[in-house]
A protein has these predicted regions:
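Non-globular targeting/processing and membrane-anchoring segments
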Residues: 1-30, 39, 43-82, 97-102, ...
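Short acidic-hydrophobic, aromatic-tinged amphipathic segments that line or gate anion-handling sites
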Residues: 12, 85-90
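Histidine-centered metal-chelating micro-motifs
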Residues: 92-95
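The conserved beta1-alpha1 loop
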Residues: 34-36
């Protein structure tokens, strides 16, 4: 079950910038898509583009986290790695701190890094619920999560 993460946990971006979770969340709520470090994760890039295409202009920091190295994250995300803030979590400390069991996951953290809500595995309905909550907190339009050609719903992969 997802839980409040450790706000003092150091997290490194694919560009090599390391800050604590608390520092990353200083100004905005966080919308974080945590992908599995598997080739199948590339199929979720269009979903990420739809979600962050709407929420990217809101007072929400849109982040993709891959529990692996920057080279694996870049291989999974392709050009999308240049569009979003990408966190790399090779030791899975962030994933474990959140208490995630299944990936992919969509996580909403408040500015103080407490958990608002999360969806684990790929259920368009559950992810829509999370994005609706993010949009409500940000006073913003809620993105349409599901789309043609998306991966089939799945319980996901072990975190």
């Amino acid at each position: 079950m997802a839980k409040n993460p450790d706000p003092l946990l150091p997290i490194t971006s694919d560009a090599g910038v390391t800050r604590t979770l608390d520092d990353w969340a200083t100004v905005f709520n966080l919308a974080i898509v945590v992908l599995p470090d598997r080739p199948e994760a590339a199929g979720f890039v269009p979903v990420i583009d739809r979600i962050f295409g709407t929420l990217g202009d809101a007072d929400v920091r849109a982040i993709v986290c891959v529990p692996s190295t920057p080279s694996i994250a870049d291989r999974i995300l392709g050009e999308a790695a240049d569009r979003y803030l990408v966190w790399c979590d090779p030791d899975r400390a962030f994933v474990q701190s959140l208490g995630l069991d299944r990936l992919p996951a969509l996580v909403h953290l408040r500015q103080d890094t407490t958990l608002v809500t999360a969806a684990q595995g790929w259920s368009p309905t559950d992810w829509q619920r999370v994005t609706d909550e993010i949009a409500r907190h940000a006073h913003w339009t809620s993105p349409k999560v599901s789309g043609r050609g998306d991966p089939a719903p799945t319980s996901g992969w072990p975190a």
